[in-house]
């Protein structure tokens, strides 16, 4: 830095950068207001900057321009978008029409005649808006309950035995090992005879 007459030159605009407005990145100096993505002009900081040669980008634009090409452009599920990067000079590939490979309705009758699957508990038709799959079978949301206590279940909290679904507590009491505690842990010890 010169002793008199200002500071280093900004890597973006070329003007003098004084200490109070200085941002340093990759050995270069920038004005705070010039430390912007080369494409979208977003303000950058040390956690959002990505450098390519002498150019600075936000991580999103850098990924679109230099990252792997494909669904989501490698940014993670939280930032998926439909921007194909045309303004970066990226030529979009011609889109192929989507053709589903399988019908999500597994019932052969339903596939052939357009009907709905039957609920494993009540036997009535289960339509997509109210369908839950548990133990590999369709259920109404209201029927997706423990067969013993009636507690609502989730696909991660159920256990299945002989085609019926149970909460973990009822399953342990009715089908688990018999004896001290019924297999529920020390907090629920009960002596069985």
UniProtKB/Swiss-Prot annotation:
InterPro entries: Znf_LIM (IPR001781)
Subcellular location: Nucleus
Presence of keyword Metal-binding: yes
Modified sites of kind N6-succinyllysine: 137
Covalent cross-link site, Glycyl lysine isopeptide (Lys-Gly) (interchain with G-Cter in SUMO2): 91
LIM zinc-binding domain ranges (all copies): 10-61, 119-170
Gene3D superfamilies per the UniProt record, alphabetical: Cysteine Rich Protein (2.10.110.10)
GO biological process: muscle tissue development; myoblast differentiation; sarcomere organization
N6-acetyllysine modifications at: 112, 131, 137, 161
Keyword terms of this UniProt record: Acetylation, Developmental protein, Differentiation, Isopeptide bond, LIM domain, Metal-binding, Nucleus, Repeat, Ubl conjugation, Zinc
Pfam family, one: LIM
Cellular component, GO annotation: cytoplasm; nucleus; Z disc
MF-aspect GO terms: actinin binding; metal ion binding; structural constituent of muscle
Motif, Nuclear localization signal: chain positions: 64-69
Tissue spec. comment: Highly expressed in the aorta; weakly found in the kidney, thymus, and intestine. Barely detectable in brain, testis, esophagus, lung, liver, aortic adventitia, vena cava, or uterus; not present in heart and skeletal muscle.
CDD domains: LIM1_CRP2 (cd09480), LIM2_CRP2 (cd09840)
Highest rank taxon of the organism: Eukaryota
Known function: Drastically down-regulated in response to PDGF-BB or cell injury, that promote smooth muscle cell proliferation and dedifferentiation. Seems to play a role in the development of the embryonic vascular system.
Subunit structure: Interacts with KAT14. The LIM domain 1 is necessary and sufficient for this interaction. Interacts with GLRX3.
This protein's name: Cysteine and glycine-rich protein 2
């Amino acid at each position: 830095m010169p002793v008199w007459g200002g500071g280093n030159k900004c890597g973006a605009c070329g003007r003098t950068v004084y200490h109070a407005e200085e941002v340093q990145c990759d050995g270069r100096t920038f004005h705070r207001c010039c430390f912007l993505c080369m494409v979208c002009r977003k303000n950058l900081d040390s956690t959002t900057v990505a450098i390519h040669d002498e150019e600075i980008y936000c991580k999103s634009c850098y990924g679109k321009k230099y990252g792997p090409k494909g669904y989501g452009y490698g940014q993670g599920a939280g930032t998926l978008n439909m921007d194909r990067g045309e303004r970066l000079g990226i030529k979009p590939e011609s889109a192929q029409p989507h053709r589903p490979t399988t019908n999500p309705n597994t019932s052969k009758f339903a596939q052939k005649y357009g009907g709905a699957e039957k609920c494993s508990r009540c036997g009535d038709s289960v339509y997509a808006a109210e369908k839950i799959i548990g133990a590999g079978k369709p259920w109404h949301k209201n029927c997706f309950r423990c067969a013993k206590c009636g507690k609502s279940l989730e696909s991660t909290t159920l256990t299945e035995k002989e085609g019926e679904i149970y909460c973990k507590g009822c399953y342990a009491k009715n089908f688990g090992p018999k004896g001290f505690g019924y297999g529920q842990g020390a907090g629920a010890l009960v002596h069985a005879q």
